Amino acid sequence: EIWKHFDADENGYIEGKFMQKYDKNSDQHVGSSAEFMEAWRDMSRLLPVQENFLLKFQGMKLTSEEFNAIFTFYDKNEPAILEMNIQQLWNY
């Protein structure tokens, strides 16, 4: 659902438009790199595990199918639950 919300043109990619939409939705101005990273961190606290996992790949262009394949690879035991927490993923 979040993917569809930020993939406005439905091309299967979340691009720079993501933060523009976040900016509009949150009434915050995201200008500098530091503000951008702070906005990413704020957003990650609001998202469930699968969407939070997307942060690991923030510089890549992934289709929803590619993202789901990567998530499924790391989701070994239960659907939509990762064993490693996000901090461990950042350090991986």
UniProtKB/Swiss-Prot annotation:
Expression by tissue: Brain.
Disulphide-bonded residues: none
GO biological process: regulation of long-term synaptic potentiation; regulation of presynaptic cytosolic calcium ion concentration
Record-level GO cellular component terms: cytosol; dendrite; nucleus; terminal bouton
Keyword Calcium among record annotations: yes
Extra information: Binds calcium.
PANTHER family: CALBINDIN, CALRETININ
Name of this chain's protein: Protein 10
Source organism (scientific name): Cavia porcellus (Guinea pig)
Phylogenetic lineage: Eukaryota, Metazoa, Chordata, Craniata, Vertebrata
